[in-house]
Amino acid sequence: MDWKGRDVISIRDFSKEDIEFVLKVAERLEEELNEKGSLDYARGKILATLFFEPSTRTRLSFESAMHRLGGSVIGFSSASSTSVKKGESLADTIKTVEQYSDVIVIRHPMEGAARLAAEVAGIPVINAGDGSNQHPTQTLLDLYTIKKAFGKIDGLTIGLLGDLKYGRTVHSLAEALAFYDVELYLISPELLRMPKHIVDELRERGVKVYETTDLEGAIPKLDVLYVTRIQRERFPDEEEYLKVKGSYQVNLEVLKNAKETLKVMHPLPRVDEIHPEVDKTKHALYFRQVFSGVPVRMALLGLTLGVLGV
């Protein structure tokens, strides 16, 4: 398909073939980067990063990706420094920014904000997270990380742990994993279970899904444990948050019954859900996961800008 000008809003907009193509392009770009250090595919192109919510990894990896493609970056990391503070609408902000740039990356607390931005923009829009809804580029780098670690995705048993109700990373990832022959363990407190419509869809698509609150019972079965923090900022009230705060911690004691080959992932930032003692074990994959953001986002930027010649 023609990727030039395409928006990246939801993992639901991707076929399995789309996903595999992005992963293949990312691998090619990673190899080129290792050989050359930097590339010039996007020379003369400008990325605008519009971050209405805090971000470290997503924003910086998109900026790094664009610079490594030879392009440049403008943008903001807080809405408080923009005319949004004066009451400017999101639509007007997008229409303004597109006059200065060739592609937009947006993170916003409102579900559907990225879709709205794509509807009004005449240039590609990439969703870097819209509320508790979707985070498609995180999902693609997660799949890339798993594939690099295991050489495959099919046949794996994957556990998603923590805040499955509000965590946009696990919503997107679960939907993407439905394209593959995997078993999914959804491990969470009762209050933070995966939304029913997502679980129902996974089962309709033939995924074996097991819901449980028992991490220690599930961990011996897992090839991948994908840990998420409790999304404090998404809770309607503090009392509900305090009920589930600190529900799980992955530590050496928990991992003693894990497979030798288990990999622990986390979209980060972490709070206390993975003990630092895990960092030095063979199980820790979360910092390699951070690195994966660069080639995957290079692939998405290059494809939507139409500069890669593929």
Curated annotation (Swiss-Prot):
EC numbers for this chain: 2.1.3.2
Catalytic activity: carbamoyl phosphate + L-aspartate = N-carbamoyl-L-aspartate + phosphate + H(+)
Top EC category: transferase
Binding site for L-aspartate: 86, 168, 229
GO cellular component annotations of the record: cytoplasm
Function: Catalyzes the condensation of carbamoyl phosphate and aspartate to form carbamoyl aspartate and inorganic phosphate, the committed step in the de novo pyrimidine nucleotide biosynthesis pathway.
Name listed for the protein in its UniProt record: Aspartate carbamoyltransferase catalytic subunit
